[in-house]
């Protein structure tokens, strides 16, 4: 387990993380793909290089800059043509 990133808390509103010594709250409003994830998968988070974290089983990556300044990165979902099949 990489000690540079740890899950501190999981609740109904989101996830509290410690990344490189700083704490961040990830609201499910900003990361909805983590809301229905298994707790064991959410707990398995690791550094992905120096500038990002990842949840390998969930295929989710987040840049640390997004954690520091979430207001700069609005959540925009794009539909693919397969969504209509």
Located regions from the model:
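Motif-centric detector for short Cys/His coordination patterns
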Residues: 1-85
């Amino acid at each position: 387990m990489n000690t540079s990133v740890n899950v501190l808390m999981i609740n109904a509103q989101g996830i509290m993380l410690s990344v490189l010594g700083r704490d961040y709250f990830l609201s499910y409003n900003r990361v909805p793909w983590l809301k229905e994830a298994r707790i064991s998968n959410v707990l398995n988070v690791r550094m992905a290089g120096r500038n990002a974290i990842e949840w390998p089983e969930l295929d989710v990556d987040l840049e640390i800059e997004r954690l520091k300044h979430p207001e700069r990165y609005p959540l925009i979902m794009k539909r693919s043509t397969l969504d209509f099949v």
